[in-house]
């Protein structure tokens, strides 16, 4: 008996809802066909740079996933690290789908909201084993309250489980990126299909590596994926992979209206939470200084270094969560380190010199959601004639101070001098949450 199963997949939406109406119609049109379909989301659906995602702590995304008819989902780093542990523990509470992630633990047990794998039985009794793993950012999952495990070790372990070994087809939902996916395809012949994400790669008609099929659908809902899997008497016979450019799908004027409406809805929710009324609008310089003051207070630090490009727009007179989100849209937290005066000098000079090169460059990734790097600024010390001046006096090269920076400086490739330092990553608050708490304390 021949059986056709169709898998629909979406990955790395990052709250780019402008394409969502087309994606929704694509999913619903396929789900209405007389073919058994399974709809998947491969993670990084949530991104708090969108005001509605910020206002709902990701729950609005989950509701939209429900509307797509998603049945199985895994998480990316935007869920696992971008959300606090408290928010991630709650975000899927009203989901109509099953979350799978096989290399994340809450201490030593599985998260209450996820399964390490599932066995999906089709209408004709074919058994599909779905496994899922997310990229192991060891340095950030642990301070966020999670234990992240090596996905290769977890895969080896899971492949020894009888119901996975006995399944008619083994499918990996991967938020690991193309390098991991390629390695798994080369080393694990037991995996029949890898549906990829994380590195935003696109396989328009799929790839085949040593007998394992690979699919991936880019990012931001610019593409959606469809995979037709054919079985004969429960034996896998063929996998046909397709992707569809959403620019080529039928659109309607109401699509852009809907996207504008949900953005406005998010902004309105954020606007309702007033933080402070300043005597007058702040200049960019004043806004930057306030951000550094908040960083120093939160971290209990002596000195701070930032780049002015972090503040996308200066703080307005009547300042709400909406204004804060627009000014600091980044998915960044803080990092602090104890350094000697000599080390502070080396760090500052490195950041300043590299900052001169980066000043007008467009910056992407590492949580940055602004445009340009901007000017390097500092607080708590001065830099004069090649020396660090602290409390209006030169300090001994061995005297230690606590420095606070944004974590982007530690993770990005620009500032290699920080990679060798012992850095404490401060969770769970994002930079804008730190500023919000500081402003609230100012009004008490």
Q: Where do the PLM segments sit?
A:
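Acidic, metal/ion-coordinating pockets
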Residues: 1-245, 284-289, 294
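A short C-terminal boundary segment appended to hydrolase-like catalytic domains
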Residues: 232-319, 325, 439-444
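Metal-centered catalytic cores of metalloenzymes
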Residues: 164-165, 297, 305, 403
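Feature captures C-terminal
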Residues: 16-17, 315-444
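Structural motif
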Residues: 174-175, 308, 405-408
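Short glycine-enriched loops at secondary-structure junctions
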Residues: 79, 134, 311, 408-409
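Flexible, glycine/charged-enriched surface loops at secondary-structure junctions
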Residues: 167-173, 287, 302-308, 359-363
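A short, polar/proline- and glycine-enriched secondary-structure boundary/capping micro-motif
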Residues: 139-143, 226, 248-256, 315-316, ...
């Amino acid at each position: 008996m021949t059986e056709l199963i169709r898998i629909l997949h979406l990955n790395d939406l990052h709250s780019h809802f402008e394409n969502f109406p087309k994606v929704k119609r694509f999913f619903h049109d396929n789900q209405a066909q007389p073919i058994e379909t399974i709809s998947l989301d491969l993670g990084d659906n949530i991104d708090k740079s969108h005001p509605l995602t910020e206002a709902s702590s990701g729950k609005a995304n989950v509701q939209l996933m429900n509307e797509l008819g998603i049945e199985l989902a895994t998480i990316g780093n935007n869920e696992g690290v971008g959300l606090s542990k408290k928010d991630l523990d709650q975000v899927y509470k009203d989901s109509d789908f099953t979350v799978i992630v096989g290399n994340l633990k809450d201490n030593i047990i599985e998260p209450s909201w996820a399964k390490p794998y599932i066995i999906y039985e089709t209408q004709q009794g074919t058994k599909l084993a779905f496994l899922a793993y997310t990229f192991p950012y060891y340095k950030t999952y642990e301070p966020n309250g999670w234990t992240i495990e090596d996905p290769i070790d977890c895969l080896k372990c899971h492949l020894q489980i009888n119901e996975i070994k006995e399944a008619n087809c083994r499918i990996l939902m991967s938020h690991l990126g193309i390098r991991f996916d390629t390695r798994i395809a080369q080393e694990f012949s037991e995996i029949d299909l890898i549906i990829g994400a994380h590195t935003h790669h696109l396989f328009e008609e799929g790839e085949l590596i040593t007998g394992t099929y690979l699919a991936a659908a880019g990012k931001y809902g610019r593409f959606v994926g469809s995979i037709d899997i054919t079985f004969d008497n429960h034996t896998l016979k063929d996998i046909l992979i397709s992707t569809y450019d959403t620019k080529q799908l039928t659109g309607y004027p109401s699509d852009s209206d809907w996207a504008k409406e949900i953005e406005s809805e998010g902004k309105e929710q954020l606007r309702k939470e007033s933080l402070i009324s300043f005597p007058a609008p702040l200049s960019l310089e004043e806004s930057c200084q306030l951000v550094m003051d908040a960083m120093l207070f939160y971290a209990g630090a002596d000195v701070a270094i930032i780049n002015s490009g972090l503040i996308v727009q200066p703080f307005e007179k009547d300042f709400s969560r909406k204004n804060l989100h627009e000014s600091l849209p980044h998915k960044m937290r803080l990092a602090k380190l104890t350094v000697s005066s000599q080390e502070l000098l080396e760090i500052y000079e490195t950041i300043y010199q590299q900052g001169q090169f980066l000043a007008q460059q467009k910056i992407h990734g590492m949580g940055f959601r602004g445009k340009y790097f901007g000017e390097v600024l500092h607080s708590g010390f001065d830099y004069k004639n090649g020396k660090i001046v602290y409390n209006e006096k030169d300090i001994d090269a061995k005297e230690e101070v606590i420095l606070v920076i944004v974590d982007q400086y530690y993770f990005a490739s620009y500032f290699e001098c920080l990679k060798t330092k012992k850095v404490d990553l401060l969770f769970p608050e994002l930079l804008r949450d730190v500023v919000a708490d500081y402003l609230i304390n100012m009004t008490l």
